[in-house]
Amino acid sequence: MDAIIRAKLNEIEHREQIRIIWAVEAGSRAWGFFSPNSDYDVRFIYIRDKKEYLRLEEIRDSIDAQQDDLLDIEGWDLRRVLRLVYRSTPEVHEWFASPTIYRSTPEGLELKKILPEYFSVKKCARNYLHTASLDFRTYFRDDEIWQVKYFYLLRQMLLAKWLLEDGSTPPMLFEELVRQKLDEQWKDYILELLGRKKASSELGKAPRNKKLIDYIEQSINRMDEEVSALKDEGKKSWELLNQYFYSVLE
């Protein structure tokens, strides 16, 4: 499959007249809770010819290259990515922590070195908790719950917990987050679900686990308060990102 994905990236470059500087696996396969029939979520960063960035009209800053049962391929323009780096958007940090890299270039590796300069515990944790709260309200009110949704919700919660407790970029693998940050009373239960997910196509629905859901809700609410109490880091300078962008376009 790696060869197929790399060939697809080459096709996209030719068709869109772009250059891809970074491409990774970014979904459940990178997080470690995929099943045999899970699709591949490929994300890439690309640049255009310098003249394209000098146009008066806005240029498209993303490419939805393919979406089917097997491949979900999407790319973001480098300028868009750099603006997200400035805001410490966790998704970009995850792309550079993925265990599966389909395309690596000197420009991509240089950007990876810059990321820590714009890393913010408060902004990243707030982002994860916001997503967790949305997922909680959307999927965890019914009497029966899709069991795989526990993984997505817990992942957001545990990423925030890692940030607040360790102050560093969290690991990508869900199992590592569970083993290091989930309360002991729930580890065996979640790891057993994870093993079943990896061995089968889907887990299906089950009656809502009220105790687990209460634990998750209380944890999210507590961490929301902790994040709000954190000091703002202050504004960062754009200069490092600007200089990097100029150098890539030369």
Please place each PLM-identified region on the residue numbering.
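Glycogenin-like
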Residues: L82-V121
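Glycine-centered secondary-structure boundary/capping sites
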Residues: Q17, D166, D183, L249-E250
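Acidic, carboxylate-rich catalytic segments that either coordinate divalent cations
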Residues: D232-E250
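General structural signal for secondary-structure boundaries
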Residues: M1, D49, D77, S120, ...
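Alpha-helix boundary/capping detector
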Residues: Y46, D68, E107-L111, R179
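Metal-dependent nucleotidyltransferase catalytic core
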Residues: M1-I20, V24-N37, R43-W95
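Conserved nucleotidyltransferase catalytic core and NTase-mimicking acidic/glycine-rich helix/loop elements
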Residues: K113-S237
